[in-house]
Structure formats: C-alpha cells, structure tokens
Amino acid sequence: MTMTDPIADMLTRLRNANQAYHDRVTMPYSKIKANIAEVLKAEGYISTWLVEEPEESVVGKRLVVELKYGQNRERSLAGIKRVSKPGLRVYAKSGELPRVLGGLGVAIISTSQGLLTDRQARKRSVGGEVLAFVW
C-alpha cells in the first residue's frame, strides 16, 4: 500500500518518538525528508541525521534521525504540525509568510530555492508552500 502523505508520516514519527523519549527514529528515505531533517538540524531541533543503506532483507534506504534532549531529558522539539496537506495545499507569498509562536518557532517552507525556514525565505523575499510548523 502506498503512503498518501510521506511528510506527515515523518513528522508523526518524530512527534511520537519525541514524546516517548526515544534517542533515534527510523523511517523510509526520500530527498524531501532528508531536506526537512537538515532544516531541523540547522535550527537545533535534532542532533543529527544519516542515511542507512538497505540490507539484503530490507527494501530501500532508511533515514535515521537522532533526537536531541537537554539536561534532565528536556525536549528540544516541543511541537510539530503539518500545515499543507495533499487535500489542501497552503501557499504563502513572501510578504505573507507565517510566524510560529511570534518568532520562537520555525515554519518550513518549500520554495524554488529549496527548503527554507520562514526567516530565510523572508530574507530572500521568496514565498512557497508552507510544509510544517516546528516549535
């Protein structure tokens, strides 16, 4: 069975693993997921990510994300929400880019220049599809 929304699947896996205090989470690999992981790493929400090559019995590459926790196991990732969905796409012009929690969070935007945060997109004056909010 095919997956309808792989980005929502990734965000749900991250949210669930974070709530359960797992150190790492594994999911099927795709370029867009790797780009989202790179944005999350650059913003300090995850420690690192890597791509595992498939074994004999496993089909396809796997994306492994190492979650980040502070001292006393405080979560770095407080919340994550999918905005644009396959049934209802959400686009924003460069002047209308959303702010998450008044600038404390990050909106991940898919632009013609790749995946950017809302701050980067505002700085470059580009709009695009609002994929997710992270705080």
Swiss-Prot record:
Molecular function GO terms recorded: rRNA binding; structural constituent of ribosome
Keyword Chloroplast: no
Keywords attached to this entry: Ribonucleoprotein, Ribosomal protein, RNA-binding, rRNA-binding
InterPro entries: Ribosomal_uS8, Ribosomal_uS8_CS, Ribosomal_uS8_sf
GO biological process, one term: translation
Keyword NADP found: no
GO cellular component: ribonucleoprotein complex; ribosome
Function of the protein: One of the primary rRNA binding proteins, it binds directly to 16S rRNA central domain where it helps coordinate assembly of the platform of the 30S subunit.
HAMAP family assigned to the protein according to its UniProt record, in alphabetical order: Ribosomal_uS8_B
Self-association and partners: Part of the 30S ribosomal subunit. Contacts proteins S5 and S12.
Entry's family note: Belongs to the universal ribosomal protein uS8 family.
Name assigned to this protein: Small ribosomal subunit protein uS8
